Curated annotation (Swiss-Prot):
GO terms for molecular function: RNA binding. Associates with spliceosomes. Involved in spliceosome assembly. The gene is smndc1. This is Survival of motor neuron-related-splicing factor 30. It comes from Xenopus tropicalis.
């Protein structure tokens, strides 16, 4: 996971350099500016995901050890679970269990809210109700706190990964638009080119019609003598 993220980060940085290079020639292009902003955001998100990898890996071993001694739960079983929004205990039903990650997908009874939580955050209904009546909430053990923190990090990482996915899709859309723009511009320029003859009329009043060298290759153009020094009177009889 970390290795893949590192490769993606290097790719994003290389793309950002290309965009910044293009902006030096076209600094007001809205598509390029949007692309630069998206790349900067996805780079920061990827860095955050990379920095969270070691702590999550370290927590895995702790959670696996804790889950092995926890109660065995079944799909469809009623339980008491902590709702992540307020940290309070509510009655819920187990919809799915992920033994590998030590988590369960639950739905809170009467509310319909669903979320994924650690198996360590579940309690039998009677035990949970009694504890809730006695203290209003169950104190979390150190292992439970670690599990809760890990769940928070997981959810945060999932949100970041989803945002990265959205930004990548936006970049793909921008890339297609940019390619279409370049193709259209190239086609327009190519179509507008006119092959001019060297004998075409000059575009300005001071222009001269060119004299070709067809048939006399490697020879200089014809030189004309300046006749301005001759006066008409020289041609008149004395």
């Amino acid at each position: 996971m970390a290795e893949d993220l590192a490769k993606q980060l290097a790719g994003y940085k290389a793309q950002l350099q290309q965009v910044e290079s293009a902006l030096t020639a076209n600094g007001e292009n809205e598509d390029l500016l949007k692309l630069k902003k998206d790349l900067q955001e996805v780079i920061e998100l990827t860095k955050d995901l990379l920095s969270s990898q070691p702590s999550e890996t370290a927590d895995d071993a702790c959670d696996d050890m804790s889950a092995s001694g926890s109660q065995s739960w079944k799909v469809g079983e009623k339980c008491m679970a902590v709702w992540s929004d307020d940290g309070q205990w509510y009655e819920a039903e187990i919809e799915e269990i992920d033994e590998e990650n030590g988590t369960a997908a639950i739905t809170f009874a009467g509310y319909g809210n669903a979320e994924v939580t650690s198996l360590l955050n579940l309690r039998p209904v009677e035990e949970g109700r009694k504890a809730k009546e006695d203290s209003g909430n169950l104190p979390m053990s150190k292992k439970e706190m670690i599990a809760a923190q890990r769940e928070y990090k997981k959810k945060k990482a999932l949100k970041k990964a989803q945002r990265i996915k959205e930004l990548e899709q936006e970049r793909e859309d921008q890339k297609v638009k940019w390619q279409q723009f370049n193709n259209k511009a190239y086609s327009k320029n190519k179509k507008g080119q006119v092959k001019r003859s060297i004998f075409a009329s000059p575009e300005s009043v001071t222009g001269k019609v060119g004299v070709g060298t067809c048939g006399i290759a490697d020879k200089p153009m014809t030189q004309y003598q300046d006749t301005s020094k001759y006066n008409v009177r020289h041609l008149m009889p004395q």
